[in-house]
Amino acid sequence: MSTTLLQSDLPGLPLRHRGKVRDVFDIPRDRLPADAPPGDYLLMVATDRLSAFDVVLPDPIPGKGEMLCQVSNFWFHKTEHLMPNHLVDIRVEQVLPEGVDPALYAKRAVVTRKLKPVPVEAIARGYLIGSGWKDYQRTGKISGIELPDGLRQAEKLPEPIFTPSTKAAVGDHDENIDFDAMVKTVGAELAERVRDATLRIYRFAADFAAECGILLADTKFEFGTDADGRLYVMDEMLTPDSSRYWPADQYELGTSPPSYDKQFVRDYLETLDWGKTAPGPSLPADVIDRTRAKYAEALQRLAGISVD
């Protein structure tokens, strides 16, 4: 059984950012292996924290961080022929402070390049669901993209589409924007590179997932650039937290299909008299267990990795 980690504190590694799920640390040069290439590096730790409706909940999902990290690493390696990523060939145990148990971080942490984030969320959609479905019902468009009339909830789109959104701070909500707004934010050349990479990776991943009996409805990527302007995909990749995966045998047009994510949590929270603001309520044990099982099933079906 995995050890649960709600928050990581690593003396000697400056905390750069504590997000909803991940803790990110700067790695001082003297903690790197002597043969590490020049440049700045980060240690990214996937904790077992769980967020819903942009609020971090008090109860962790045991082993969730390890499962997310393993799914991400699987996809980073699977897609490196399509797009370079932030991973580097430095082992986690090489940079951990003395006295820290390497086993606690072995499956939930990675050493990465330190990149300049592109300040836009890159979203690919292959099916009409979620906020895209709501936008379509209201306007017939998603992020300014005209779609055919008469599409139904969860319907497969004629072609995958790129629908960027703002990158909100913790506790705030992302907002869908059109491509022109993205161009104004990051410039035309970078916007086109991000759009092309997003759709290229999505198509590849959707085809692979289909072979595993899973539909990849949509997914969100984050990108960053190095000092030379090279583009990398970063943060997490095609995890149940950043993607909407549906069991193909349970897909039904006109409904919101079950997914490999925290839907059990959202459904439970919707039954409560809670204003969807911090602090979040505690979760019953059965909701935690069922959510963990969904993450574990996604890891096994996609990457062939079983957990205890």
Curated annotation (Swiss-Prot):
SUPFAM superfamilies for this protein: SAICAR synthase-like (SSF56104)
Domain of life where this protein originates: Bacteria
CDD domains to which the protein is assigned, alphabetical: SAICAR_synt_Sc
TM region positions: none
Recorded catalytic activity of this chain's protein: 5-amino-1-(5-phospho-D-ribosyl)imidazole-4-carboxylate + L-aspartate + ATP = (2S)-2-[5-amino-1-(5-phospho-beta-D-ribosyl)imidazole-4-carboxamido]succinate + ADP + phosphate + 2 H(+)
GO molecular function: ATP binding; phosphoribosylaminoimidazolesuccinocarboxamide synthase activity
Class of this enzyme: ligase
GO cellular component, one term: cytoplasm
Pathway: Purine metabolism; IMP biosynthesis via de novo pathway; 5-amino-1-(5-phospho-D-ribosyl)imidazole-4-carboxamide from 5-amino-1-(5-phospho-D-ribosyl)imidazole-4-carboxylate: step 1/2
InterPro entries hit by this protein: SAICAR_synt/ADE2_N (IPR028923), SAICAR_synth (IPR001636), SAICAR_synthetase_CS (IPR018236)
GO terms of biological process kind: 'de novo' IMP biosynthetic process
PROSITE patterns attached to this UniProt entry: SAICAR_SYNTHETASE_1, SAICAR_SYNTHETASE_2
Keyword Transferase: no
This enzyme's EC code(s): 6.3.2.6
Keywords: ATP-binding, Ligase, Nucleotide-binding, Purine biosynthesis
Classification via Pfam families: SAICAR_synt (PF01259)
PANTHER family, alphabetized: PHOSPHORIBOSYLAMINOIMIDAZOLE-SUCCINOCARBOXAMIDE SYNTHASE
Family: Belongs to the SAICAR synthetase family.
Protein name: Phosphoribosylaminoimidazole-succinocarboxamide synthase
Source organism per UniProt: Xanthomonas oryzae pv. oryzae (strain PXO99A)
